[in-house]
Amino acid sequence: MDDGAGNVSFYARSRDYHEYCEGLFARLIPALEERFGERFLGFADKSPIQENIAASMAGLGVLGDNFMLISEKYGSFVFVAEILSTAEPETLGFSGGTPEPSYCPHCGACRRACPMVSEGMECLSAVTQKKGALSAEEEAYLKRYGYAWGCDICQLACPLTKAAMAAGAQTPIAFFHEDRIPVLTEDRLSRMDETEFRRRAFSWRGREPLLRNLKLLEK
């Protein structure tokens, strides 16, 4: 993980996590189907289930007041993906039953830190991803907090995530350490060909929102 400095949210600094998940599914699913004789499907982000709740129910972390999954080891800087199956839980070695999700201590740090909550506005991350013109108020918030894409303010305020970062939490997966872009510039964006651009999580809204945001930050 970087030290936090930059204008791109942590999750979008590496290549697109969807790319990693697709490769993971391609390796795991054929082996699972061969072993169990059932159908398996992988999902990441676009999923038929509420991923953060399901992950908490699976014991992978607690749900924060910012709706993020918070892992004890990694804080909220985690990606959630899942493989669903037609197999019965017992077939896969699970005892069955429906566990309940777990929740954070509700200290309120994330909500207090968010510059948008008190104003009744959209998450700053959503503002950075909007297409078209921003309102004067939205432009002011974007320039004040310096994000070209996404926002980590509520996550960085969370004491559970702070503890994970202080402990030096780092993913062992090399993919997420390679070719990172903590700071995006107009020059860096212009030098990306379409293939490279499409390998980034910030590409899904096209180049225009990014260019607009970068121009605002440079004013």
Which residues fall in each region the model found?
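Short Fe-S-cluster ligation motifs
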Residues: 134-153, 182-203
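Short, charged low-complexity linear segments at domain edges
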Residues: 72-98, 117-139, 190-194
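Alpha-helical packing segments of well-folded alpha/beta enzyme cores
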Residues: 24-28, 110, 154, 210-214
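Extended alpha-helical surfaces
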Residues: 162, 169-188, 199
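Auxiliary alpha/beta "docking" domains used to position bulky ligands
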Residues: 1-103
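Long, compositionally biased charged/polar accessory segments in the mid-to-C-terminal portions
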Residues: 195, 203-219
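Iron-sulfur cluster-binding cysteine motifs and their immediate structural context
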Residues: 109-128, 146-174
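Short, contiguous, pocket-lining structural segments
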Residues: 75, 99-109, 143-150
